[in-house]
């Protein structure tokens, strides 16, 4: 086996708020993948850090009457506590407010400047004359210039959905001091992303080398534009004092924008680890490095990681990521997390309610498939699945067999001829097991496929134990050897299943290692042509007394959790603008279209359609060709959803189409209708999907 050298990162949580269950999707996903790779025997380092700079941190510290350094130190402790509670095993968890990150931020900036990729331009912004600072968009409020609604933010109106700049607001005021802002010009520093050296590199990098998922690469193609055009804009990388961050070298009262030094925090954190453990930093970061570098991120920050970041690294003489893995958002009970419903759940509250963190790790693993699709935490399904899969199926194997081994056989599994008979049973009954399928699913981050395969094998073990019925055999003293074989078989298969689940359930795996009296659950390796039985525990192996491993979820615990968060959040008055992502990506709602009559609407024939096939369209950057079943016939439709969907993931899905739209002749063929999808400034397209029970051909009314 070739040993791989791998560096893995998760996106840096902002040092201005609590970790919640939405954040944990990414850290659990990354941790599972890292643990799997380490079980393969590879050299893997997993680093992360608090994203500790920016205006929101500076202002919050001021409100609390403490220094920004004191604030980020406190939040760092809270974040690390929560991550540890969910068994996230970083090799290094650091802060961007560090000497290491400062060094690499300045180094990259100086190299970009020397390459002629830094430009200085004067821009006009709103300025708070009381606080003496320039106001980010979301720190300005006023009257909407379109509809006149009051108390609207500086970038968009929540009443009519209009988008605008802060300088267009009527009667603007500072959301910090209440003062009327003035217009003031200032010199800002820009990374010239539009330079052909960047745009040409990114066009090639995003489309080659499997650096991005298909959906992500398609989205990058949209942002880059068609061949021959350049839709990229230069990136403002500076902020004016007062600001909490790193000063730009050689400048006065100019600071690096938080999004410049945030990804550089990956380098700073790893450098800290290198210093502590004697690791060669250049082996992982120099241009041309043969080691592997993977970034796990949310799809909302794809723009920064797949455009700005690789362009900066390439032009500053560093290596670029091997791959960037983007995941979707978390919904709870099918809806956005809500403070009023108590579903905006913090990691701290989950742990304080004494819920097992591995329940959530398992549920997320069962949902994550390596794509950018959103995942839903359905709390009722959460209870059902954990209780049925983990307790009712998996743990049940050990609990039904271990007692007999300890009580009747002094903790020893079968040996000699009975061990050979056990091996024969394993190879005959479990011939369909495919350990390689589980391994491939973990490697591809398709944890849901891995869990499905493991649970199918778990069902097979339970079926055999049910047939053997050791609890019945135990009633007949003449069948002692048969009882010993049956229970030993259960324990042996429980051992294998535990090895496969160890990346997901690391704490339970440690307890199982004690129970099985086995130093460490390693990844079972089945050599080519070798039967499954060669991966079992040794003949005559002695186990320890069984102690209960995982308890069931009581639905009352979930009710208490949501109630605790509802009560906590109703007393919280944190402003919207305290998160970095509020600066990075704002939601703009399009205005409602002109009113139509019911007669006009009734002319539209909307039908449920099943996607029978989905294919790329040669020569089209944005289109997929869909073959739709609408009950009475099939239709071919061209849909502009290529940037968001892999064709293979669409097959079999239900959607909604306009069935009576006149066919449209396109250069790629005839489009016989239109599928419905949602999109906006914050993302999309998102294909509409009907509720379960809908059938192809049904009319939507």
UniProtKB/Swiss-Prot annotation:
Known cofactor(s): Zn(2+)
Residues bound to Zn(2+): 144, 147, 157, 160
Molecular functions per Gene Ontology: ATP binding; metal ion binding; methionine-tRNA ligase activity; tRNA binding
Domain of life where this protein originates: Bacteria
InterPro entries in the record: aa-tRNA-synth_I_CS, Anticodon_Met, Met-tRNA-synth_bsu_C, Met-tRNA_ligase_1, Met-tRNA_synth, Methionyl/Leucyl_tRNA_Synth, MetRS_core, MetRS_Zn
Record-linked Pfam families: Anticodon_3, tRNA-synt_1g, tRNA_bind
Alphabetical keyword list: Aminoacyl-tRNA synthetase, ATP-binding, Cytoplasm, Ligase, Metal-binding, Nucleotide-binding, Protein biosynthesis, RNA-binding, tRNA-binding, Zinc
One GO CC term on file: cytosol
Catalysis performed (reactions): tRNA(Met) + L-methionine + ATP = L-methionyl-tRNA(Met) + AMP + diphosphate
PROSITE patterns registered for this protein in UniProt: AA_TRNA_LIGASE_I, TRBD
Subunit structure: Homodimer.
Family: Belongs to the class-I aminoacyl-tRNA synthetase family. MetG type 1 subfamily.
Function field: Is required not only for elongation of protein synthesis but also for the initiation of all mRNA translation through initiator tRNA(fMet) aminoacylation.
HAMAP family xref list: Met_tRNA_synth_type1
Protein name in UniProt: Methionine--tRNA ligase
Biological classification of the source: Bacteria, Pseudomonadati, Pseudomonadota, Betaproteobacteria, Nitrosomonadales
Gene that this sequence comes from: metG
